[in-house]
Amino acid sequence: MLDSSARQYIVRPNMYRTLLRDLCFLSLLSMVCLVPACKKPQRSGIVIGSKFFTEQVILAELLAQRIEARTGIPVERKTNLGGTLLVHKALLAGQIDLYVEYTGTALTAVLNEPPDRSSSAAGKGVADPVYQRVKQLYAQRFNLEVTEPLGFENTFAMVIRGEDANNFHVRTISDIVRYAPRWRVGVGYEFLERPDGFHGWTDFYHLQFAETPRVMDLGLIYRVLVDRQVDLVAGNSTDGLIDALNLVALEDDRHYFPRYDAVPIIRKSTLDRFPQLGAVLSELGGKISESDIRKMNYAVDVTHRDAAVVVREFRATKGW
């Protein structure tokens, strides 16, 4: 069981409330798209959005502060909007101008392209074939600009308890094949349904678990793992809670997952209105390391610090 201090920094949203909120927001977006006569006046500034987890809120705040400092353009924050497809639809509908996506997610969940596992052995950043494919297709299909990667990858992490990693001497996903029939799994609802998610992963590694995966909000997965309600969860590699709770992320030794480089995506119409944004976003290319984002995630998730304050302090250390 988690002690009282650990419980304080585990988020406990209800998954079904999250799904209901997403559906309601999608309905509102649909009404906006179906009523062209109700044309909105052009904004004097921009709106930056985010998905519904800590890292996304941090990245939205980082972009907002950087843009405000460098250009003086007013920035509205619309964070915690929901999952991948909902935020993508908000971008297409003009409800937001900009958000940070992950290249592997864009390829599989948005573009419905098969995972490109060659990227694991190829170059990273702009040299990555997944990045190049996503950049090309987002421009062609959506009239969106995929800017330079920020410098870190946030891939799916198959996470187990540290004591189990030591007791069973496992460090890679292939190592757990023999134990999987006795193990229970917890996943987020998006990972369960994605083409690069649970079913493809288990087939690729020939994994069979004790029961159907338990689907839950991402804010709950580490709690149920530490509480021994499950034995493995699908988390994110940059989560600060992995180290905080003495958990171990297994190595994807057969390179199932493509690269998931963090990239800002912006409407080209927004770039037309504010061409200076292109230079500001390019300046951030390659400037945020995996260690940087993990420390910021830890500060917000574990020590309960405000994301805006954490970002300001990070920018100060970088001289931004």
Where do the language-model regions lie?
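Contiguous mixed-secondary-structure segments that line small-molecule binding/active-site clefts
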Residues: T103-D203, L207-T212, D231, N236-R294, ...
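C-terminal motif of bacterial Sec signal peptides marking the signal peptidase cleavage site
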Residues: L34-A37
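Hydrophobic residues within well-ordered alpha-helices
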Residues: L91-L92, I176, V224-V226
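Short, well-ordered beta-strand elements
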Residues: Q42-E55, I73-T79, P181-V187
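Acidic helix-start/capping segments at beta-turn-to-alpha-helix junctions
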Residues: K78-I96, T103-T108, P115
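Bacterial N-terminal signal peptides that target proteins for export
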Residues: Y9-F25
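Short helix-initiation/N-cap motifs at beta->coil->alpha
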Residues: E76-K89, E211-R223
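Short, polar/charged alpha-helical segment
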Residues: T54-P74, P195, H199-D203
